[in-house]
């Protein structure tokens, strides 16, 4: 069986009047994230990881922020498109591991809902999806509550 690993990383700054959407879930918070799309930093990192595993570039290549067609775009639609590209190359998700790096908001109440949506969008068992959160102990931009960073790692396996 052929395996491929992909790593994704994304950062967005807090601001604006959009709702805060993380992993497809609307998370109650004072502000959303500044972005051309809906700003779902979790789904952007995962999309990048999938594209990376497939050697297909990054989300900026597929959904440029210079294209008005993607203004306010639903990142779940973008994620499903990236996953379809992997399926077209006969690869499917083996597992996904996501780390949300944020001082705020607290992620624990939202992790299971995020896992459920990811399992649905990636057509996989929830046991193949892990989402965890950490802080930077008040260090750096995430520690100062200026934004959120996310890392994602995927293992893609050749579909049989």
Curated annotation (Swiss-Prot):
Q: What EC number(s) does the entry state?
A: 4.6.1.12
Q: Name one GO molecular function term.
A: metal ion binding
Give the protein's recorded name.
2-C-methyl-D-erythritol 2,4-cyclodiphosphate synthase
Q: Provide one Gene Ontology biological process annotation.
A: isopentenyl diphosphate biosynthetic process, methylerythritol 4-phosphate pathway
Per the UniProt entry, what species is this protein from, by scientific name? Shewanella denitrificans (strain OS217 / ATCC BAA-1090 / DSM 15013)
Q: Which domain of life is it from?
A: Bacteria
Query: Site positions for Transition state stabilizer, renumbered to this chain?
Result: 36, 135
Describe the subunit structure: Homotrimer.
NCBIfam families named in the record: ispF (TIGR00151)
Q: Which Gene3D superfamilies match?
A: 2-C-methyl-D-erythritol 2,4-cyclodiphosphate synthase
């Amino acid at each position: 069986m052929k395996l491929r690993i992909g790593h994704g990383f994304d950062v967005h700054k807090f601001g604006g009047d959009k709702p805060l959407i993380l992993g497809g879930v609307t998370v109650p918070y004072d502000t959303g994230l500044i972005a051309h799309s809906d700003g779902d930093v979790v789904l952007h990192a995962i999309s990048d990881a999938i594209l990376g595993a497939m050697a297909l570039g990054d989300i900026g290549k597929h959904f440029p922020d210079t294209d008005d067609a993607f203004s306010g775009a639903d990142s779940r639609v973008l994620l499903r498109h990236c996953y379809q590209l992997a399926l077209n190359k006969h690869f499917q998700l083996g597992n996904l591991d996501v780390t949300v790096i944020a001082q705020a908001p607290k992620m624990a109440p939202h992790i299971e809902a995020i896992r459920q949506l990811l399992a649905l969008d990636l057509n996989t068992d929830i046991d193949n999806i892990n989402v965890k959160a950490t802080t930077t102990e008040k260090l750096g931009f995430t520690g100062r509550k200026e934004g959120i960073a996310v890392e994602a790692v995927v293992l893609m396996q050749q579909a049989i």
